[in-house]
A protein has these predicted regions:
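ATP-binding N-lobe of GHMP and related small-molecule kinases
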Residues: 1-109
Length: 113
């Protein structure tokens, strides 16, 4: 079982200036980002199942037979990248409501950790 706790982040300045496309093509050079970690967290719990099913729990519960059936884009693509095809439980929660539209506190970045 793996459990992670990652702080959410608030950016004050420089949102996309740290992307290579910006600093390689900008006349200003490298980007500058000012942000801070918050005292609110994203929690992830991952454990092996004893069958071949995949269960993903966040604001909805997904119980599927294959990785391709997972609706949560980040989790689906992370499992594909890692070569995990079956037999896993993933629970994703946070101290704030999570939304697929984004909340501006880097919850998807925290999930990637």
């Amino acid at each position: 079982m793996i459990i992670s706790k990652t702080p959410l982040r608030m950016s004050f300045f420089g949102g996309g200036t740290d992307f290579a496309d910006y600093y390689k093509n900008s006349r200003y050079g490298y980007g500058t980002v000012i942000s801070t970690a918050l005292d609110m967290y994203v929690y992830i719990m991952v454990c092996k199942r004893f069958d071949d099913k995949i269960r993903v729990c966040y604001t909805v519960n997904e119980f599927v037979d294959s990785v391709d059936q997972i609706k949560h884009n980040i989790i689906r693509e992370a499992l594909k990248m890692l070569g995990i095809e079956k037999g896993i439980d993933i629970v994703y929660s946070a101290d704030i409501p999570l939304s697929s539209a984004g909340i501006g506190l880097a919850s998807s970045s925290a999930l990637a950790v």
